[in-house]
Swiss-Prot record:
Organism in which the protein naturally occurs: Mus musculus (Mouse)
Tissue: Expressed in red blood cells, brain, heart, kidney and muscle. Lower expression is observed in liver. Not expressed in lung, spleen, testis and thymus.
Chain positions recorded as ATP binding sites: E89, H90, L91
UniProt-recorded name of the protein: Fructosamine-3-kinase
Modified residues (N-acetylmethionine): M1
Enzyme class, first EC level, given as a word: transferase
Name of encoding gene: Fn3k
Any Pfam family the entry gives: Fructosamin_kin
Similarity annotation: Belongs to the fructosamine kinase family.
């Protein structure tokens, strides 16, 4: 692999440093190169290129806002024996602590970014002498993303939809439940789902949802800080409801209260927030069930029952 990296990165220097690491899905290695330190993720699954290309597109979208700090993505490279590697900027990070409040503010700004773009675009169109065309981005009007992304190793369809409940039900919940049906044929899950899915539109009654660019997998293992401030990484981005982002952040710990306080100063909770948060947590429990097995069956069904009360 090192010979491949030297050739693809056009570097004479390739010296490993630090300890190898990674998460549940991929291995991780750090190297010094002629152009500076890089972090290399390695995955030998057949769909590794698709997974890494989705992550690269997500990092680029987040980075282009100028509102949050992410590692600069560099290159996805196929491995000769199957799988792929993803090369990105190496950042010397530590666990999120003193920068939690700042990250809350930055995530709120990120979630408001597309709305502000759309408002600017409308203003330009309504101004005499200003056409709709121009170099400035116009803002996104639908829910989805321009490419497949993976939350963990599961590919997510991001086909554009006009309304959020349709997108979320079809491309997030139903997609996860189809995998559970295939692998477990769990009758109780299907019975609860048949009752729940007809109630989902009611949870969104009376609220306006503007597509927001999301990180898509904002748990504590995907956030950190360094000397310059907060850092987020390992995204599975798409344009969705801003509240979706907070579900996994509130599930497994690691985010101080200051994060949520700072966030909600900029984006207050809308009516029905708590019940929708449960709905978004359901997606994450189902995704964990599909990744890690039946230990996540009980919390998945528990959330479904709560939503049916």
């Amino acid at each position: 692999m090192e010979q491949l990296l030297r050739a693809q990165l056009h570097t004479t220097t390739l010296r490993a440093f630090g300890s190898s690491g990674g998460g549940c899905i991929s291995e991780g290695y750090a190297y010094y190169t002629d152009s500076g330190p890089v972090f290399v993720k390695v995955n030998r699954r057949t769909q590794a290129r698709q997974m890494f290309e989705g992550e690269m597109a997500s990092l680029e979208a987040l980075r282009n806002t100028g509102l949050v700090r992410v590692p600069k993505p560099m290159k996805v490279i196929d491995l000769p024996g199957g799988g792929a590697v993803f090369v990105m900027e190496h950042l010397k990070m530590k666990s999120l602590s003193s920068q939690a409040s700042k990250l809350g503010e930055q995530m709120a700004d990120l979630h408001l970014y597309n709305q502000k773009l759309r408002e600017k675009s409308k203003t330009r169109q309504n101004t005499v002498g200003c056409g709709a065309e121009g170099a400035e981005p116009q803002g996104v009007t639908k829910f989805g993303f321009h490419t497949v992304t993976c939350c963990g190793f599961i590919p997510q369809v991001n086909e554009w939809q006009e309304d959020w409940p349709t997108f979320f039900t079809r491309h997030r919940l139903q997609a996860q439940l189809d995998l559970i049906e295939k692998d477990y044929a769990d009758r109780e899950t299907q019975e609860l789902w048949s009752r729940l899915q007809v109630k989902i539109p009611d949870l969104f009654a009376g609220i306006e949802i503007v597509p927001a660019l999301l990180h898509g997998d904002l748990w504590s293992g995907n956030v950190a800080e360094d000397d310059q401030g907060p850092v987020i990484y390992d995204p599975a981005s798409f344009y969705g409801h801003s509240e979706f982002e907070l579900a996994i952040a509130s599930m497994f710990g690691g985010f101080p209260r200051s994060f949520f306080t700072a966030y909600h100063r900029k984006i207050p909770k809308a009516p029905g927030f708590d019940k929708r948060l449960l709905l978004y947590q359901l997606f994450n429990y189902l995704n964990h069930w599909n990744h890690f097995g039946r230990e996540y069956r009980s919390p998945s069904l528990g959330v479904m029952r709560k939503l049916l009360r």
